[in-house]
Amino acid sequence: MSLKTKYRDIIVPKLMKEFGYTNIHQVPKVVKVTINRGLGEGAQNAKALESSLAEIAKIAGQKPVVTRAKKAIAGFKIRAGMPVGLMVTLRGDRRDAFLERLINLSLPRIRDFRGISPRSFDGRGNYTLGLREQLIFPEITYDSIDQIRGMDITIVTSANSDEEGRALLRELGMPFREN
């Protein structure tokens, strides 16, 4: 069952009952998924930028945007306009396909995985997940990487509170850790 049909047929009625919504448009939904990676030392290294671009494009199925420094910071040896990170925003079918792969394939591949922290909500129902390595994604092979790099994944929902957002993600299959 795809994420879209599961949401429409199972999750919407369940959340309407749980939170007492009167209209299906009140039920929270996933608006977008943003994948972000800071380059760190790769800001000076063009090869690291290229490999990061290729990795994020493989993982997301969409070419990332290079984020650039707005100001020069001498302490970090960064000049204005230098690449400092990569970002990709997924919506629609790409978002659903990525979430399905993340929940069912990638998260279980994390070493010593006991669930993700239920505390990483921002107060408005959005969830941010930090990953330490890119190898958990099946698209990335060990031989194709030059260095282990992490990334941040933000799941933006239309929920009004963390409680609603947590209920939505739990129903979608996110494996939250029991504290």
From Swiss-Prot:
PROSITE patterns the UniProt entry points to: RIBOSOMAL_L5
Alphabetic keyword roster: Ribonucleoprotein, Ribosomal protein, RNA-binding, rRNA-binding, tRNA-binding
InterPro entries referenced in this protein's UniProt entry, alphabetically: Ribosomal_uL5 (IPR002132), Ribosomal_uL5_bac-type (IPR020930), Ribosomal_uL5_C (IPR031309), Ribosomal_uL5_CS (IPR020929), Ribosomal_uL5_dom_sf (IPR022803), Ribosomal_uL5_N (IPR031310)
Subunit structure, as described in the record: Part of the 50S ribosomal subunit; part of the 5S rRNA/L5/L18/L25 subcomplex. Contacts the 5S rRNA and the P site tRNA. Forms a bridge to the 30S subunit in the 70S ribosome.
Primary role: This is one of the proteins that bind and probably mediate the attachment of the 5S RNA into the large ribosomal subunit, where it forms part of the central protuberance. In the 70S ribosome it contacts protein S13 of the 30S subunit (bridge B1b), connecting the 2 subunits; this bridge is implicated in subunit movement. Contacts the P site tRNA; the 5S rRNA and some of its associated proteins might help stabilize positioning of ribosome-bound tRNAs.
Similarity section: Belongs to the universal ribosomal protein uL5 family.
HAMAP family: Ribosomal_uL5_B
Designated name of the protein: Large ribosomal subunit protein uL5
Name of encoding gene: rplE
